[in-house]
Amino acid sequence: MRCPSCQHHGTRVLDSRPVDEGRSIRRRRECEQCHYRFTTFEKVEEMPLIVVKKQGMREEFSRDKILRGLIKACEKRPVALEELEKITQDIERELRNQGVAEVKSETIGEMVMERLSKVDEVAYVRFASVYRQFKDLNVFIEELKELIKKEQR
């Protein structure tokens, strides 16, 4: 690591500690030549994950967008914010572990619905009604019947 003060290449690490929930490492360094002390941050460079929308448009993956949708679906429901954050984190981790550069928005929606159905059925129905854009009451009733079948298994 080059010293920002004298440009010497030799530095030593005085202290290292994880930050940002373990996603980064903060290092305190000292130049071997001029003894200037400085801090560096090291983190894994994640490749951008692109979401392909229904109309073919592409946008960068946003975990906040998933979390906002979950919060809206769980409004006035007994679901802790921590649970919704965990769902969001699990979905992002699963998508990144697939090692693909692009993912369809439908895939993400299905992942959200699968997890939400295990947490709160009312929130699941709310999310599904917006996500699937039910055309009429019969389609909505069919979705409810499927949910009841799953619950009885």
Curated annotation (Swiss-Prot):
Domain of life (superkingdom): Bacteria
GO biological process: negative regulation of DNA-templated transcription
InterPro entries: ATP-cone_dom, NrdR-like_N, RNR_NrdR-like
Record protein name field: Transcriptional repressor NrdR
Residue ranges annotated for the ATP-cone domain, each copy included: 49-139
Zinc finger (unnamed): 3-34
The protein's role, per its UniProt record: Negatively regulates transcription of bacterial ribonucleotide reductase nrd genes and operons by binding to NrdR-boxes.
Record-linked NCBIfam families: transcriptional regulator NrdR
Leader sequence segment: none
Disulfide feature: none
Family, per entry: Belongs to the NrdR family.
Cofactor(s) listed in the protein's UniProt record: Zn(2+)
Molecular-function GO terms, alphabetical: ATP binding; DNA binding; zinc ion binding
